[in-house]
Amino acid sequence: HPIYKDLLSHIEKESKINLSGYNDILAGHAVDASISKVAGGTITITNKGKSEIMMPLLITYEDGTTERENVNPSQQDLILEKYRNIKSAILDPDQTSLDINPENNRYPRPGIGIRIFTGFDSPSKKDIYLSPLIGYNSYDGIMLGLSMYNSTFPAKNLKWNITPFYGFDSDQLVGQSWISYDTKFKSDKIRKIQYRLGIKSFSIANNEDANIQLRYIRIDPCITLHHYHNPASKLYSKTSLRQLWTGTDISYLEIDRFTQNITRLTHNRYNFDKLQPNELEVELEYNQYHAGSFLDSQDYLKLSLDYRHGFLFGKHRKLDIRLFAAKFLMNSQRQSSSYNNLLAQGSIALLNQGFTDYSYNDYYFDRQGQSKRAYRQIGYHGGGFKDALGSANGRIGQSNDFAMAINLKTHLPFGQAKLPLKLFFDAGYARTKSFSADPLKGEVFYSGGVMIEIGDGLFAFHLPLIVSQKISDIYKSESRNLLSKITFSMDLHRLNPWELADDYIF
């Protein structure tokens, strides 16, 4: 069967024009040619990308005349001698080459332009985008913020984002920022290497007696190797090494700050097949944490696996299966009956809420699990259960040794297929204990019900109807009615526009 390479070969043969650069583009390699230097009548063009493509060059001389010619920047610098002083030059003036960074296609370099929200990057300005934001959590209250960033589409190699918020309840400046740089490769093994540094800090509690606001900070440098796959395969994979440092203010036990040093080696593999999409995450995590002089330092080494597979069984109808397992290969607190607190961190949680998110990876309205409404927010990491029991019942479904789970969700096989109503069922096993003197023993949990899901996991509401005994006992002890069992979730990481535009383009 003919493929795109056959078409390009035929056009090359008939036109006598080298089109190998377009073959590189179709193979997923970026175009980034740059006017790197202009001195008198000499112009230097550098190919910063991994595709060699013919593109027009428009030169304006100081005497007012213009000249237009086609150039083909290779992997070496292309130096053109014009013997007349050059006033300005534009590479690819008609924007037909799919160059990912049109800002460096001009001499002189463009000035700064301010744009609101998003759009295609302007070739005549160095765009800075502004987006006003509003947020909320239980301790900062309503937050007003402004997100500033330098790249939308096509994504630049150097990207940054600064998003400060002001919390009206905390009277604090909070928020997050990051900067990243991509090194692209023309290789059948490596697509790019991304270097990234992020920082995030929000309030986590308040000490009303001392009238101080407690907050956390997370700093996470990361290097990610993006493997190359033929775009026609619908596969994508990456391997990342991340070092996280977290510091959490504490107002009791004479401890000022609880710190963690977490190292994560993670491999992700995605298959964007329409009929059977699936993804795999394998992660090895080492954590050394310390709660001041009051407690000894502790550490662990944890291996986890997360596999998700979807089965399309009708138009707009899908069954999703998720398998999760995690095991502590080493844990100095394996025999502890404390979970995700000062005494024992990194515990495997079948039921995830704000107080189990020990590395501050996600966004929660309430991280203490005590707010009457906000604590009903759950996360899909770990065991992926849809129940919210609060921090007072935080020992349920947690383990410092081993846990595994299966999560099922499906559209209804009848009725309107486009309705977001689904059924779910979660089952899990955890080796756990209630008291430190007890031996570790396996416990089984399950929960099933109905859910409303928007955006394939972006936002969801869940109503558990059938639950295992321990979960049922908590519901009964708190006299929960049907409405008070409803939980909600949101996965804001799925809204990352830079990953959507540059990586997950299937």
Regions found by a protein language model. Name each.
Residues 126, 140-144, 171-175, 191-193, ...:
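Residues that define the transmembrane beta-barrel architecture of outer-membrane proteins
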Residues 126-138, 144-152, 156-168, 191-209, ...:
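Transmembrane beta-strand segments that form the barrel wall of outer-membrane beta-barrel proteins
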Residues 317-331, 343-350, 455-506:
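Predominantly the C-terminal beta-signal and adjacent terminal strand-loop region
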Residues 134, 192-212, 219-226, 249, ...:
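C-terminal outer-membrane beta-barrel translocator/porin domains of Gram-negative envelope proteins
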Residues 63-76, 80-192, 221-229, 252-276, ...:
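Outer-membrane beta-barrel initiation region
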Residues 2-93:
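Beta-strand-rich binding/interaction modules
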Residues 308, 376-387, 403, 412-414, ...:
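Outer-membrane beta-barrel transmembrane domain signature
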Residues 162-185, 203-205, 435-473:
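Strand-loop-strand
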